[in-house]
Amino acid sequence: MKKRFVLLSALFLSFKFIFSQSINPDNVKSISFQKQNENKFSNIFVGTINEKFSLSFDILSGLEHDLYYVIEHCDFNWEKSQLIKSEYIQGFDDVKIDNYSSSFNTYQIYTHYNISFPNSNTSFKKSGNYIIKIIDEYGDEIFRRKFILYENLVTVQTEIKRSREIEFINEKQVVNFEINPINIQLNNPSKTVKVKVFKNNELN
């Protein structure tokens, strides 16, 4: 009976330790993308396939967690595509984030994390929609963000006008655009070309 009590106590202590190390998503702040050599931060990233950029965030904790990133290639509707990992990534993902630092002499204690792409482990082979997931050492997802990589295969001319409907003239706009191929043949464009307009840099 005594041995059983000791075993149960050990299991309880182990569970308590794991629980205390978990990350509350509400404690993740300042999630933002940044293009290399730019001071501007954004909640989305849209760039060329070889463009350098980074994702950074803060965790309001004095602990330095072991965090990893996982990358998924998506279709137009942001569903996971049929491509296997090796078709869109050169190298591999599920890599530990090793660039982090703890705050010093601040009222709010936090740990700052930063991931740069491309890096020695991960670079991109395909353009398209992507989702990056940040997971902890137990495989639990902390948060995810969307980003877009493109290739200059066409030129797009756009024109933005006020809505023609009087009731919405100060609220809505009309977007006219023209797509001109450069290094690609657009066969059946009514089906192969898809267009989406983002409002206020929101991909959702």
Predicted features and spans:
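Low-complexity, Pro/Ser/Thr- and charge-rich linker/hinge segments at domain boundaries
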Residues: 23-26, 149-174
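Ligand-binding face of N-terminal immunoglobulin V-set domains in extracellular IgSF glycoproteins
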Residues: 109-121, 127, 134
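A short beta-turn/strand-edge loop motif at beta-sheet boundaries
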Residues: 61-65, 123-124, 184-190
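Bacterial Sec-dependent N-terminal signal peptides
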Residues: 1-23
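Short acidic/polar inter-strand loop motif in beta-rich domains
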Residues: 76-78, 136-142, 202
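Internal, hydrophobic beta-strand segments that form the core of beta-sheet-rich folds
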Residues: 126-138, 194-199
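Contiguous beta-strand segments within globular domains
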Residues: 31-73, 168-181
